UniProtKB/Swiss-Prot annotation:
It comes from the Eukaryota. The modification Phosphothreonine is found at T283. This is Centrosomal protein CCDC61. The modification N-acetylmethionine is found at M1. Signal peptide: none annotated. GO terms for molecular function: identical protein binding; microtubule binding. Residues 176-203, 246-273 form a coiled coil. Residues 1-143 are annotated as: Head domain. Microtubule-binding centrosomal protein required for centriole cohesion, independently of the centrosome-associated protein/CEP250 and rootletin/CROCC linker. In interphase, required for anchoring microtubule at the mother centriole subdistal appendages and for centrosome positioning. During mitosis, may be involved in spindle assembly and chromatin alignment by regulating the organization of spindle microtubules into a symmetrical structure. Plays a non-essential role in ciliogenesis. Residues 284-413, 429-476 are annotated as: Disordered. The coiled-coil domains are involved in microtubule-binding. Residues 449-458 have a biased composition (Polar residues). Keywords: Acetylation, Cell projection, Cilium biogenesis/degradation, Coiled coil, Cytoplasm, Cytoskeleton, Phosphoprotein.
């Protein structure tokens, strides 16, 4: 293995700087240590046998070449497992005794040579052990001034010789020096230009990124402008639709308000009519039949003389029928006002009253027939006079009702009033015809062409009048107006009144 020719390093031992020089020539190791402060020198030469024998005594044998490498590593401090230390003889004895474990005894008197000797210790540290290799270095004293002066002179001569040899190269060296300075300057400029180029590249990249960002922002702005135009168009159309909807809703609101006012007015009218119906169900004092007939004749003359509204004619006809009826208890079980108007009960009570009136009229007719036949002429004439008047009155009431009718409820009530008034005339004429048949058994009248033609015309006129009233929504005789149809109509009236009341409650809640 090739060994270095020589090595010199500065090493600090125990806080003092020393210069250590190592020279390996073949199988000989030359070692020299010099104190930088005092210029004292210690020098020693060791062959390969001495080194190997020393390592063998320590118990960790090393070859000469390996030992030299370890010494070199310790000087250059390239390995942490080997270090150096410089000890005196006293330090070495104390270290040896501490290693052997004995007490430090009294030291024997030492010579000056031992005191001046130094020991260079190569310390090899392993995992669980430390091995010391001591190398003794005899004291060489201080350098000789004569020798030093000779060395100085030889160095000066060598320097002059080198300068003489290089005298012709001074200009070249100067030029090289200038070129080196120029290279140094250009190198610094190159570094500056590289730095500037790097900054320029960064700026260019930043500018490119800025341009890309600007382009993306422009595209985003264009997209937003397009969306804005679309939204404006949609907003305009939506605003138009909303304005149309608002106008339509305002119109519907006005219509609803108008219908609400109409319904409130109708509800008020129906409430008043209901109150009148409830008042009509109360018990009234008995009145003579003659007064009832007079009032009915006055009512017929009034209806023939002028046009009367539907409500007033209905009230007057109810008042006339109420005065002409005999006194009967009210159909109400308690006699007080009912909490709710029941049209079915009202119709049943009305039919019951009509049957009672019919029976009363038949009884009066029997009594009149039993007392004598003097009343036949007036009764027949009265019936002949009453029927056209009743027909005229029924027509006028039907026309007036058809003009003032606003709903199916009012139409049905007007038909019920017409049925009640006309059924009385029909019953009365029926009783008169029966009395005629009874008189015909004892003394049949002689038929005349005038009476025959008048009877045919009266019958035909009555049938035509009934068909006309039935088609125009007027009264229909009780025989033709069945109880099943009455019950269906009354159920329809109940349903419509209930729906109207619920609608008015919803309107009140909404408002």
């Amino acid at each position: 293995m090739d060994q270095p020719a020589g090595l010199q390093v500065d090493y600090i031992f125990r806080g003092v700087e020393h210069a250590v020089r190592v020279v390996v020539s073949g199988q000989v190791l030359e070692l020299e240590v010099e104190d930088r402060m005092t210029a004292d020198q210690w020098r020693g030469e060791f062959d390969a046998n001495f080194i190997e024998d020393l390592t063998h005594k320590t118990g960790n044998f090393k070859q000469f070449s390996i030992f030299c490498n370890m010494l070199e590593s310790a000087l250059t401090q390239s390995s942490e497992s080997v270090t150096l230390d410089l000890l005196t003889y006293t330090d070495l004895e104390s270290l040896r005794s501490r290693k052997l474990g004995g007490r430090p005894g009294a030291l024997a008197p030492r010579s000056a040579q031992l005191n001046s000797k130094r020991y260079l210790i190569l310390i090899y540290s392993v995992e669980f052990d430390r091995i010391h290799y001591p190398l003794p270095l005899p004291y060489q004293g201080k350098p000789d001034p004569v020798v030093l002066q000779g060395i100085i002179r030889s160095l000066k001569e060598e320097l002059g010789h080198l300068r003489g040899l290089n005298g012709g190269q001074d200009a070249r060296e100067t030029e090289i020096w200038h070129l080196r300075e120029q290279v140094t300057r250009l190198t610094s400029e190159k570094r500056e230009l590289e730095a500037q180029l790097g900054r320029s590249r960064e700026e260019a990249l930043a500018g490119r990124a800025a341009r890309q960002e600007a382009e993306s922002l422009r595209g985003l702005v264009r997209g937003l402008e397009l969306e804005l135009r679309q939204e404006r168009g949609l907003g305009g159309r939506a605003a138009g639709r909303r304005s149309q909807d608002s106008r339509r809703l305002a119109k519907e609101l006005e219509e609803v308000k108008a219908s609400e006012r109409n319904l409130r007015a109708r509800l008020k009218t129906l409430n008043s009519e209901l109150a009148m119906y409830r008042r009509g169900r109360r018990t009234l004092p008995p009145v003579a039949v003659r007064e009832g007939r007079a009032s009915s004749s006055r009512e017929r003359s009034t209806s023939r003389g002028r046009a009367v509204t539907r409500s007033s004619s209905r009230e007057s006809s109810r008042g006339a029928r109420g005065r002409g009826r005999p006194a009967h208890p009210s159909p109400s079980p308690t006699g007080s006002r009912a909490p709710r108007f029941d049209p079915t009960a009202f119709v049943k009570a009305k039919e019951k009253k009509q049957r009672e009136i019919r029976m009363k009229q038949q009884q009066q007719q029997r009594n009149r027939m039993g007392s004598g036949g003097s009343g036949d002429g007036p009764s027949v004439s009265w019936s002949q006079q009453t029927r056209p008047a009743a027909a005229v009155t029924g027509r006028g009431d039907a026309v007036n009702r058809s003009r003032n009718r606003s709903s199916s409820v009012d139409s049905f009530r007007s038909r019920c009033s017409s049925v009640s008034s006309c059924s009385e005339l029909e019953d009365f004429s029926h009783s008169v015809s029966r009395s005629r048949r009874c008189r015909g058994r004892g003394k049949p009248p002689s038929p005349t062409p005038w009476s025959r033609s008048k009877t045919k015309s009266t019958t035909q006129e009555r049938s035509d009048h009934q068909r006309h009233l039935a088609s125009s929504g007027g009264w229909v005789p009780i025989k033709e107006y069945s109880s099943d149809f009455q019950g269906a109509d009354m159920a329809e009236i109940d349903a419509r009144l209930k729906a109207l009341q619920e609608y008015m409650n919803r309107l009140d809640t909404r408002s």
